[in-house]
């Protein structure tokens, strides 16, 4: 029997990494928000890798943090190892990666949600999205509870119609044995959404006590204090090592001789798997010329013996899993605590969404996370905060929040999803960003914190700290521009130490810092300003000075890019009326309904010639409209 269980401004369905960010954003913007989850024990669950960050992903965590989100703060509270990756490369690809204590991560996030004003957490299975006309009106749960709202954000992760597969054993289940959502897919299909089927997998968890680490290579974290969040200074965390080992010919032979028992090759698995995170059997088949593959053992937490075997994702039967693992150096006597498995689940075609992550045909209904065909906790969190912000703005009847490709990796991801769609689980890569030198780990706050403050998500404390940092960056930059490096005896000694030639005349500190062999350490010695500026400020200034030419070039490219982005397209526009467009362009543009010329230019199958035709058509239509108004 159905009954009215409560009225809210925003309802979020699913409390994974997308759901918690969406719900927190909505609540922090002052809206009464309900967060529904299949189980109160799987809030912010890490069903796969117990890690946060990595190339591109780590920048997204910083972007979420800069906007006022929670993933960065929560990771800093609970990590057990942290490293800065790609330190030998340019600033565009440097990023943080942390091993999280997965149980503590969940506990801390749940605590944050429970203490958040305006946010209500409940356990329930959502079975239906309630819609009146073209507007969302709430949700129905399996027990008959009707929760009404003006906006709904669906963040159901890999729980939609999901099933677990281990060899020839398969059964309906959510990740890690949690309940699954069996009826919500039908509700979405009934509402006209096109659904697809994806697959992902996770490796076995092994007992640390049965591992011989003396045969492996230790991978320690960084000793220096590192944080994802700009608010986390002073937090001290442990530094627990990961361990590296390798597969070998014996491992590969076991896999190749048993491919007939792999559901991936027998046809049992129908869903498409992630291209950039293949299973071990897929790697052995696809890269048959490789004699070995890296395997990392990662601790799952401080208070557990479970270790995650990164690089050994598989859906092979359990008896083969143990046989295969025991061929690896250090794992000869290993015991499995949880077997590896594959999981299939439903997702929606993300081209059915606007850049706000709102459905094109149902007002107030938003989607975020793996239901949009992505993979990864970080990608989910990035979408979640944007969907939560836009749900809140929709209820408040304010202008939507859209991040451009030139402003954030989150903007790159969302534009890719809604413009190009997905053929396999989408993963963010630095190569997907045209302006990655501007979308760096170190400047996420400079790009996004003001935006977060304007929409009411950034706290006054964060805003104060941000402005203090900006002031220090400007102060150091001004100092370098105004002060000269001269060839004094003391300075000549410092220059010799750093292998640089003395200037004939005095040059500015900024000009001196441009030299490849000179860093901020040398600048501090020259001007005797050691300890006067924080490390993050010095890093920022050094990057801005050394890469000034490249940054200016990208900013000019963005100016050209923004001209296209500024040319809006009507949402109900019929592209078949435009003479000269290719048949493929008409079909794709009518399906995607891009919001502007820039987005239209990125639709697959649309050529530069098609864009030229479209621009001419829009100009002629504009002239006709102007002539009509003059008449």
Swiss-Prot record:
It is found in: Cytoplasm. InterPro entries: FAD/NAD-bd_sf, GIDA_C_N, MnmG, MnmG-rel, MnmG-rel_CS, MnmG_C, MnmG_C_subdom, MnmG_C_subdom_sf. Keywords: Cytoplasm, FAD, Flavoprotein, NAD, tRNA processing. Its cofactor is FAD. One of its GO terms (cellular component) is cytosol. PROSITE patterns: GIDA_1, GIDA_2. Transmembrane segments: none annotated. FAD binds at residues 14-19. Its main location: cytoplasm. GO terms for molecular function: flavin adenine dinucleotide binding. Signal peptide: none annotated. It comes from the Bacteria. NAD(+) binds at residues 273-287. GO terms for biological process: tRNA methylation; tRNA wobble uridine modification. Homodimer. Heterotetramer of two MnmE and two MnmG subunits. NCBIfam families: mnmG_gidA. NAD-binding protein involved in the addition of a carboxymethylaminomethyl (cmnm) group at the wobble position (U34) of certain tRNAs, forming tRNA-cmnm(5)s(2)U34. This is tRNA uridine 5-carboxymethylaminomethyl modification enzyme MnmG. It comes from Carboxydothermus hydrogenoformans (strain ATCC BAA-161 / DSM 6008 / Z-2901).
